[in-house]
């Protein structure tokens, strides 16, 4: 390429900014060329300021650092940063329907919808229906130059959704040469393995005026089941402390004891029923008493006939991904360059769930059932029963399986260049589309199952009782015992249902920038402005038979919106070359947006950068950001869901309250028809209900500010220290009132005539909750604050280079107010599982001649499994109230041959650090902990 002088400066700036090989300081990077050494700042701004700095805190991760461990997907590496939560990592992506295989980012654990993900500062199509959540695994890791993680509201500069911050992937502009790499890894104590293969090639053409490149990437991993590892194969359950002193509130005398080899005895694969005591079926269908042992709590027990639910759970999903990327640019003349990018990504993930089950609503079995063993018939006759209710997992019908296939394509076409000596422009058009196919296998047709279970004997042959069903092909099923389900019965009851989603994004935009707009005594004014039009579309289709199957019905929904935006940013040098004020700059930014859904919205930002001397700089920002409701929140149809609740009308729960609160709740429970002695055995039961969108939603608004400093002492060359305090507050946060909150709000009101009670349905006879309806509302408030510390030190050692870096986050506050008007009612999550008060990554690299050594240690502070509010209500809920301090280390060594070949061998989780006691590492919070164990990996790469 043949850039003019201004372009050369910009390219030089970009190259140096991404030159370091570790997670770099949020403040500065030392970079060297043959003639001089200078400090370079990554700005988190659209204004290029070579040799200057900006007030926004930015953490930079180089592309090489992303590939340093055995991670085969970008998301795996990024989710280990202290600033990011593990809300949707690959390990826990299957916990929601339709999300298996996704890896989306969540800055500050304030919601994936509030983190804006960009590629080269531009929007990227979503991978999740109804949202703007970007699957970062679709980004080609081979071409990543660096990743900028920007803290705080950045809507004024980058647009809506940047409420908690921005993650901006900067790709290599010109790709030259061949880069081939293959990685293979396997776990130490299981058959789990991963692999990755990438090939990239780029070349200049037309005497350097153009560049063309392509990249192909494959990544895959095996399924890892809980039963595949000794530590996670054991079932843990909290049981009542039988030795607790009456009325004890002593944490050393807890209510519950986390107990291994424990679980429910009232359900299993063979079938369980309660008739003059709990009984289960032998494999042949005969019956026996359930052995509950001596440690019993409701329908749970230990060292007994408990059922291990972990036989159905996975630690890692089966996953494959194929990426094809193409890019090209051509210098049309000295001041104009055309560029084009295209990508296609196909990812496939398989999530294994529990079989269809019947617990709260048992299967009704009649006395004359064709498969009923004579021993049970005799017992029913003795007790005068015509039918019984059987609780079971229908394991004979197979585990429910969800195969998710995503196809993502994205195209970018643009012109950029220079007008005169000082003005730089970039105009672009983007189209992106994601197609999702969700195939649900072993999906029970509930009506067919009911017909098949209700069988009778006719002329010595088992047939379905219902004549119409029999004529339609009904095949009777024997659910008693194990191994008795025929293939014909399975085929009649199960179906394969397929749901599809299509997400589309269209963007037209342009920016114009002048880093030297006007010269002031203190320096040049920098200016950037732009316009953008964006259209988002999403459509989700359910299969025709979804309504009558066991899989959750998500509901069909579709919607679209567009937004027109104009924005501007200016950097004004105020003072320079004064005592204690080497440079003082003011940054201002504003954006006006017109949405087809919510109407007008304005965001802004102000920042101050104060360079005291060559060694010390202070910085601060204050901003207002918004997040417009996404398509799913606006137009999501009411779909089937399941809510985990503990009914507040239970006598045990009422007895834990103050007399005044108990009196109000008892009166409302009675008014709802709940018996006064109601005390369901099913604590934390899963209640069926509906959840969906609300087209009356408005935008969320946030205010955030940061205050920080950067210190680069002259007396320790290569050392850079930055510390930033950040504070984020979100009002009118879009939230569905939790099912538990809805129950409590219903019962704590003066009467049952309120919006919460109207959304809850109870059985008129038993008083049990049978259904809950939840919709999104602008009802919540979120706030978080913390301190980020970033220390980088580069130095020489024994004729080699050492690059060390410490990235640390101290979380001071993370509060959620379910109802923003009730400021005294909130949950504190700082220090809660997944949101440790202290988190840190320490990396060190040593390179000498052709050798390279890498080390990383991650630290997660002790976390609580209960919020302070929960412990205030009950200070001794369990003997397992926290996970201890967690250290995990990775190491690798590499050797580069003169012919371009490089070999690398590494071990992740070098010391085989176990998971915290009782967890599987697949929850939204516990996914921070490694569930694979010690993992060996090797990489062969070749560059020329």
Which role does the model predict for each range below?
Residues 122-151:
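Short acidic/polar hinge/loop motifs at secondary-structure boundaries
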Residues 445-447, 812-815, 857-870, 894-944:
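C-terminal beta-signal and adjacent terminal beta-strands/loops
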Residues 74-77, 103-106, 135-137, 161-182, ...:
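N-terminal periplasmic accessory domains that precede
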Residues 224, 230-239, 280-321, 325, ...:
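Surface-exposed, low-complexity loop segments enriched in small/polar and acidic residues
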Residues 439, 447, 623, 636, ...:
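C-terminal beta-signal and terminal closure region of outer-membrane beta-barrel proteins
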Residues 1-82, 198, 202-204, 241, ...:
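N-terminal Sec signal peptide and the immediately downstream disordered periplasmic leader
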Residues 50, 78-123:
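Extracytoplasmic beta-strand/coil segments of soluble accessory domains associated
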Residues 33-35, 50, 174-177, 190, ...:
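Short loop/turn motifs that connect adjacent beta-strands in outer-membrane beta-barrel proteins
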């Amino acid at each position: 390429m043949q850039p003019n002088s201004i372009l050369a400066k910009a390219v030089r700036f970009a190259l140096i900014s991404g030159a370091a090989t570790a997670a770099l300081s949020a403040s500065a990077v030392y970079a060297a060329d043959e003639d001089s050494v200078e400090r370079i700042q990554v700005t988190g701004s659209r204004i290029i300021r070579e040799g200057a700095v900006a007030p926004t805190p930015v953490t930079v991760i180089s592309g090489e650092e992303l590939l340093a461990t055995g991670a085969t997907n970008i998301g795996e590496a990024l989710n280990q940063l202290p600033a990011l939560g593990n809300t949707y990592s690959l390990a826990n992506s299957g916990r929601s329907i339709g999300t298996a295989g996704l890896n989306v980012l969540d800055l500050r654990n304030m919601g994936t919808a509030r983190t804006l993900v960009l590629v080269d500062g531009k929007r990227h199509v979503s991978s999740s229906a109804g949202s703007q959540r970007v699957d970062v695994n679709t980004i080609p890791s081979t071409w990543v130059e660096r990743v900028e993680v920007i803290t705080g509201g950045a809507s004024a500069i980058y647009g809506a959704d940047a409420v908690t911050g921005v993650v901006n992937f900067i790709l290599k502009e010109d790709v030259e040469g061949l880069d081939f790499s293959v990685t293979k890894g396997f776990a130490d104590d299981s058959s789990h393995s991963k692999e990755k293969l990438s090939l990239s090639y780029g070349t200049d053409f037309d005497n350097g005026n153009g560049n063309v490149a392509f990249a192909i990437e494959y990544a895959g991993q095996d399924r890892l089941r809980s039963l595949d590892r000794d530590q996670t194969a054991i079932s843990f359950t909290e049981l009542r402390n039988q030795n607790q002193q009456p009325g004890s509130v002593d944490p050393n005398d807890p209510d519950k004891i986390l107990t291994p080899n424990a679980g429910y005895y009232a359900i299993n694969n063979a079938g369980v029923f309660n008739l003059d005591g709990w009984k289960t079926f032998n494999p042949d269908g005969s019956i026996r008493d359930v052995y509950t042992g001596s440690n019993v709590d409701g329908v749970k027990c230990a060292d007994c006939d408990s059922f291990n639910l972990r036989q159905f759970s996975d630690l890692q999903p089966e996953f494959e991904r194929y990426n094809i990327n193409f890019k090209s640019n051509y210098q049309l003349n000295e001041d104009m360059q055309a560029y084009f990018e295209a990508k296609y990504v196909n990812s496939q993930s398989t999530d294994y769930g529990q079989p269809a089950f019947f617990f709260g609503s048992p299967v009704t079995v009649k006395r004359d059932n064709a498969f009923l063993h004579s021993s049970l018939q005799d017992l029913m006759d003795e007790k005068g029963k015509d039918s019984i209710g059987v609780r079971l997992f229908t394991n004979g019908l197979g585990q429910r399986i969800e195969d998710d296939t995503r196809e993502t394509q994205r195209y970018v076409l643009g012109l950029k260049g220079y007008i005169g000596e000082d003005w730089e422009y970039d105009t672009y058009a983007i189209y992106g589309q994601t197609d999702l196919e969700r195939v649900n296998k072993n999906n029970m047709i509930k009506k067919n199952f009911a017909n098949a279970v209700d069988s009778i004997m006719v002329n010595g042959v088992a047939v379905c009782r219902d004549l119409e069903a029999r004529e339609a092909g009904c095949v009777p099923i024997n659910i008693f015992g194990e191994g008795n389900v025929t293939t014909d019965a399975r085929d009649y009851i199960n179906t394969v249902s397929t749901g599809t989603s299509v997400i589309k994004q269209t963007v037209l935009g342009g920016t114009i920038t002048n880093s030297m707009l006007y010269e002031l005594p203190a320096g040049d004014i920098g200016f950037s402005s732009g316009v953008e039009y964006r259209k988002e579309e999403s459509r989700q289709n359910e299969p025709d038979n979804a309504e009558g199957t066991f899989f959750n019905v998500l509901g069909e929904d579709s919607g679209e919106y567009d937004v027109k935006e104009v924005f501007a940013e200016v950097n004004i040098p105020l003072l320079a070359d004064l005592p204690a004020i080497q440079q003082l700059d003011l940054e201002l930014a504003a954006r006006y947006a017109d949405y087809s859904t919510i109407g007008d919205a304005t965001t802004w930002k102000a920042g101050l950068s104060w360079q005291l001397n060559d060694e010390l700089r202070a910085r601060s920002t204050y901003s207002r950001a918004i997040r417009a409701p996404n398509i799913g929140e606006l137009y999501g149809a009411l779909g089937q869901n399941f809510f985990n609740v503990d009914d507040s009308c239970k006598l045990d729960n009422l007895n834990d309250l103050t007399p005044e609160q108990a009196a109000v709740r008892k009166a409302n429970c009675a008014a709802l028809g709940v018996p006064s002695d109601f005390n369901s055995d099913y604590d934390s039961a899963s209640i069926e209900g509906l959840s969906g969108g609300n087209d009356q939603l408005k935008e969320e608004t946030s205010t955030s500010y940061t205050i920080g400093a950067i210190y680069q002492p002259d007396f320790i060359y290569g050392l850079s220290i930055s510390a930033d305090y950040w504070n984020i507050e979100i009002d009118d946060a879009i939230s569905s009132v939790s099912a538990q909150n809805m129950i409590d709000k219903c019962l704590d009101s003066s009467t049952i005539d309120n919006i919460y009670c109207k959304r809850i349905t109870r059985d008129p006879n038993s008083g049990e909750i049978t259904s809950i309806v939840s919709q999104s509302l602008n009802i919540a408030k979120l706030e978080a604050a913390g301190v980020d510390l970033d220390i980088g030190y580069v130095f020489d050692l024994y004729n080699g280079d050492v690059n060390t870096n410490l990235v640390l986050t101290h979380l001071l506050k993370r509060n959620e107010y379910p109802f923003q008007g009730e400021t005294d009612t909130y949950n504190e999550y700082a220090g809660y599982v997944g949101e440790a008060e202290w988190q840190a990554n320490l990396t060190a690299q040593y390179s000498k001649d052709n050798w390279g050594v890498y080390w990383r240690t991650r630290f997660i502070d002790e976390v609580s499994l209960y919020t302070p509010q929960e412990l205030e209500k009950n200070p001794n809920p369990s003997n397992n109230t926290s996970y201890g301090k967690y250290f995990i280390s990775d190491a690798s060594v590499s050797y580069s041959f003169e012919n371009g070949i490089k070999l690398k061998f590494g071990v992740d989780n070098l010391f085989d650090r176990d998971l915290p006691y009782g967890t599987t590492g697949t929850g939204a919070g516990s996914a921070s902990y490694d569930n694979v164990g010690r993992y060996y990996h090797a990489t062969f790469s070749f560059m020329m």
